[in-house]
């Protein structure tokens, strides 16, 4: 499974986060956990756009694309509109993207 993640917006818009994650490269436990999060969120059945409060201009917007075999789906979701079922995956991908950014700045790799 390939997951592409991007977080835009927020108070400091230049702190965009991006991540490309191939779950086949992860340790088995982490791979299962992330793939289970995708499945339990109903990701492939979510609408392509979930809009939040238009007044929340400083809110984050997340773009997540999941490719799994011959299936591919992209969801763009405002922070205020993230369904409860999707929030664990968004949190995990955000943390992973932050780890990757830190590793890139120090020349290390993320396990």
Question: Which functions belong to the PLM regions below?
Answer:
Residues 1-111:
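Function-determining sites in protein domains
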